[in-house]
Structures are given as C-alpha cells and as structure tokens.
C-alpha cells in the first residue's frame, strides 16, 4: 500500500515481490533474490535492473571482496548498460565484505580493512 500511496501504478499486491515472497516452484528463505529474479525472468523480458547493493544483481557465494569480484566478473560490462548501481554509503553487502562479515573484530580493524579496500587495485 505504501507504493500506491506514493503514486506508483500498483494494481494489486501480486505486482510487488517483497523479501521471502513465494515465487513459482522456487523456495528460498530470507532475503536472497535469486528465486524472485528467476521467476520475473520467466514471466517478462527484463530491460534493466537498479539496486543499491551487489546482491540486487548477483549472489556471491561468500561476502568477501574476492567472492564479489568473481560473481560479477561475467557481467562487468552490464553495469551502466543493463544494471545501474545507486550509491548508498550506509548499507549493502559491500559494507562488511572488506573484513569478510567478521563482526566480532574491533572497530579499528574494520576501518583498516575498509581503507585498504578503497585503494586502487592493479
């Protein structure tokens, strides 16, 4: 209803695929998007995708920088053409990837890994 209240042309609730929405014969718990992407692709031609996190486009096996690079490598040419990444500096899988989702490490160490990740890669 929030989308309708903001003027989006939503005719019914089936047009919104929120987290954990059952789609076809695909069962996936949590916030993974693979099932929803597959279902939409079977129903319609997807012209472009926009998101604020890498997981909006592909699913990396682990939340590390190396795994993210590997997951996106086949699609790198799609960014800016078919896929559009919207900046969101406060949220996304990229945020904890530099320290491999290890939330138990000290803040200073997390900051160090983030700064290291900002250095240009050759």
Regions inferred by a protein language model and the residue ranges of each:
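C-terminal cap/substrate-recognition subdomain and adjoining C-terminal extension
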Residues: 2-122
């Amino acid at each position: 209803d929030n989308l309708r209240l903001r003027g989006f042309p939503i005719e019914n609730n089936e047009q919104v695929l929120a987290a954990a929405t059952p789609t076809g014969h695909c069962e996936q718990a949590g916030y993974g998007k693979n099932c929803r992407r597959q279902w939409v692709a079977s129903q319609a031609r997807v012209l472009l995708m926009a998101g604020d996190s890498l997981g909006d486009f592909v699913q990396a096996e682990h939340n590390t920088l190396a795994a993210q690079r590997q997951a996106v490598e086949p699609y790198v040419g799609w960014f800016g053409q078919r896929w559009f990444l919207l900046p969101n500096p406060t949220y996304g899988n990229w945020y904890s990837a530099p320290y491999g989702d290890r939330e138990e490490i000290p803040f200073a160490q997390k900051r160090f890994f983030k700064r290291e990740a900002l250095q240009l890669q050759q």
